[in-house]
Amino acid sequence: MHTPVLFEHPLNEKMRTWLRIEFLIQQMAFHPMIATHADALHFFRNAGDLLDVLERGEVRTDLVKELERQQRKLQSWAEVPGVDQERINELRQQLKQSSSTLMAAPRIGQFLREDRLIALVRQRLSIPGGCCSFDLPTLHIWLHMPQAHRDEQVASWLASLDPLIQSLNLILDLIRNSALFRKQTSLNGFYQDNGEDADLLRLRLDLAHQLYPQISGHKSRFAIRFLPLDSEYGIVPERFDFELACC
């Protein structure tokens, strides 16, 4: 029985940022019912990391530009004979709506940034053990509030990210589905190829080999070296087949 493992690697800084944002939001939304101190620290640590990422660049501007770029790509696809025009028009409408919603939304993350509880916890997370009850009595009392109260507050925090989530999910879905997986073969654990202006590499490996990829490169060229999970006794086959999509 084969167990495929999917690896994704960004080929530019924009995609790297988007994948990090996606990961952090998934972590925040994974367990929205905060019932324990551990649940709270998991949520607030990821919320703080998300705000750090959002503060580093022009996320909204990059997303709007990408939404427009995807619309242009769909426009060119619409001229191809036999293409599903209904699906193309549906996607173009989704892109336009996401762009309008994102442009009209307040500064991304501002609702979280202005929340007093998030700000207090965020300040203490950099201190080892800094979220004890005597350090953060505000969090301690909040965790003793009714569960429904906490659920409502968490839901409002996540809802404030909806314009970002909607646009990002649409963009990443289009990029991920822009290329098919193709069988490739590495020689002595090494593979290289041209990126052809790709934004994202997606690799599928069989878990049975217990190998993982170490990827370097950019949109025009990339290299992949396969390494064994067991660095001492693991073996890399002379010829190793895997699946690759350059998106």
UniProtKB/Swiss-Prot annotation:
It comes from the Bacteria. Keywords: Cell cycle, Cell division, Cytoplasm, Septation. InterPro entries: ZapD (IPR009777), ZapD_C (IPR027462), ZapD_sf (IPR036268). It is found in: Cytoplasm. Pfam families: ZapD. One of its GO terms (biological process) is FtsZ-dependent cytokinesis. Its main location: cytoplasm. One of its GO terms (cellular component) is cytoplasm. PANTHER family: CELL DIVISION PROTEIN ZAPD. Belongs to the ZapD family. Cell division factor that enhances FtsZ-ring assembly. Directly interacts with FtsZ and promotes bundling of FtsZ protofilaments, with a reduction in FtsZ GTPase activity. Interacts with FtsZ. This is Cell division protein ZapD. The gene is zapD.
